[in-house]
C-alpha cells in the first residue's frame, strides 16, 4: 500500500496530465492510517464510463496505448522500494510459470493442449530473455474494466483506476496485459493491436527485444486468466458463469496461434 501511495504521488508530479485517483490525507496529515491492524487509505473518485462499455474504434485503441505509454515513461523516474513485487504471485506475469501446476484444471482439451505447448515455448525461449528487459513499477492490471472514458468524447481515455496490482516487473508487461484484455472479443485483432502499440510507442518506444516477445507475453496473460478461472470453477462448482467468462480468452489465444502472432 505504501508503494502504491508513493507512485500516485509521483505520477501527480511527473505526469499531471494523466488522471489517477488522488490520495486524501487523514486529519493527522498522513496518507495511510491504521485501525485495528488494518491499513486505511482514502482515494478520490474519478468520473467516467468504463472502457468495456464503449464501442471500440482505432482512435480509441490508439489513445489506450497513448495513456499507457505516458504512464510507462513516467515510471522510469520512480525508484521502486524493496518488497514491491505485488500481492499475488499467481497473477504476476513475470511469475506466470507458477500457474503451470494448475494446468490440469483446464477442462477444455484444445485449450489445455495449446497452453501446454505455450508453456514449453515460454520456458525455453521467452523466460530466459526476461532478465535483460527494462524494469520499473507497472500498473499490472490495465484492462478494459479499469480504463475510464468520457462518454461525451469516446475517443479519449480520461483515467486509469485500481492500483492494487502495482508491482515491480518488466515494463513491457503492462502493454502485454492491456493487449490481452483489450482484444477480447475483437474480430480485427490486427487493427486493434496495431493501434494500441502505435499509441504506446509515440510516448514510450518499445525495444526490439521487447517487441519480439510481446505477443507471447500477451498470450501468457491469457493463460493466467484461463488457468485461474478454471481453478476458481473447481472451487465454486455451482458458479456456471466462471467458465463461460473464460470463453473469449480461449478464443483469442487460439486466434493468436492460428494467425501466427505466436508459433507453437
Segments from the language model and where they lie:
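A conserved alpha-helical element in kinase catalytic cores
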Residues: 1-38, 59-62
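A glycine-centered beta->alpha junction motif in the catalytic cores
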Residues: 40-54, 96-105, 224-239
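An alpha-helical support segment within catalytic cores of ATP-dependent transferases
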Residues: 80, 98-140, 150-152, 205
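Active-site acidic catalytic loop and adjacent metal/ATP-binding pocket
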Residues: 23, 123-172
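All-alpha amphipathic helical-bundle segments outside canonical DNA-binding/catalytic cores
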Residues: 59, 208-218
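Active-site activation/catalytic loop segments of kinase-like enzymes and analogous catalytic loops
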Residues: 171-205, 219-237
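ATP/Mg2+ or Mg2+-diphosphate-binding catalytic cores
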Residues: 102, 225-264
Amino acid at each position: 500500500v505504501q508503494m502504491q501511495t508513493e507512485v500516485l504521488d509521483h505520477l501527480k508530479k511527473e505526469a499531471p496530465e494523466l488522471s489517477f485517483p488522488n490520495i486524501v490525507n487523514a486529519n493527522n496529515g498522513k496518507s495511510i492510517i491504521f485501525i485495528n491492524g488494518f491499513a486505511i487509505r482514502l482515494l478520490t473518485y474519478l468520473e467516467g464510463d468504463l472502457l468495456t462499455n464503449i464501442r471500440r474504434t482505432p482512435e480509441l485503441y490508439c489513445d489506450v496505448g497513448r495513456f499507457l505509454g505516458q504512464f510507462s515513461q513516467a515510471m522510469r523516474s520512480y525508484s521502486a522500494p524493496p518488497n514491491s513485487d505485488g500481492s499475488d504471485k499467481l497473477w504476476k506475469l513475470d511469475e506466470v510459470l507458477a500457474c503451470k501446476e494448475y494446468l490440469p484444471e483446464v477442462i477444455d482439451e484444445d485449450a489445455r493442449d495449446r497452453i501446454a505447448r505455450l508453456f514449453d515455448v515460454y520456458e525455453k525461449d521467452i523466460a530466459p530473455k526476461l532478465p535483460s528487459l527494462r524494469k520499473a513499477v507497472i500498473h499490472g492490471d490495465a484492462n478494459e474494466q479499469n480504463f475510464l472514458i468520457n462518454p461525451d468524447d469516446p475517443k479519449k481515455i480520461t483515467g486509469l483506476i485500481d492500483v492494487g496490482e502495482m508491482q515491480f516487473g518488466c515494463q513491457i508487461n503492462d502493454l502485454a496485459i492491456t493487449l490481452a484484455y483489450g482484444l477480447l472479443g475483437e474480430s480485427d485483432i490486427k487493427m486493434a493491436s496495431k493501434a494500441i502499440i502505435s499509441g504506446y510507442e509515440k510516448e514510450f518506444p518499445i525495444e526490439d527485444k521487447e517487441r519480439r516477445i510481446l505477443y507471447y507475453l500477451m498470450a501468457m496473460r491469457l493463460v493466467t486468466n484461463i488457468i485461474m478461472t478454471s481453478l476458481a470453477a473447481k472451487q465454486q462448482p455451482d458458479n456456471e458463469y466462471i467458465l463461460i467468462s473464460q470463453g473469449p480468452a480461449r478464443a483469442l489465444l487460439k486466434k493468436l496461434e492460428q494467425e501466427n502472432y505466436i508459433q507453437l
